[in-house]
Swiss-Prot record:
Subcellular location: Secreted
Protein's name according to its UniProt entry: Orcokinin
Coiled-coil intervals: none
Organism listed in the record: Faxonius limosus
Main location: secreted
This protein's GO CC annotations: extracellular region
Described function: Myotropic peptide, enhances both the frequency and amplitude of spontaneous hindgut contractions.
Keyword tags: Neuropeptide, Secreted
Length: 13
């Protein structure tokens, strides 16, 4: 998901 902050906090998960 590049649209929002994910588990890693980068939003690349």
């Amino acid at each position: 998901n590049f649209d929002e902050i994910d588990r890693s906090g980068f939003g690349f998960n």
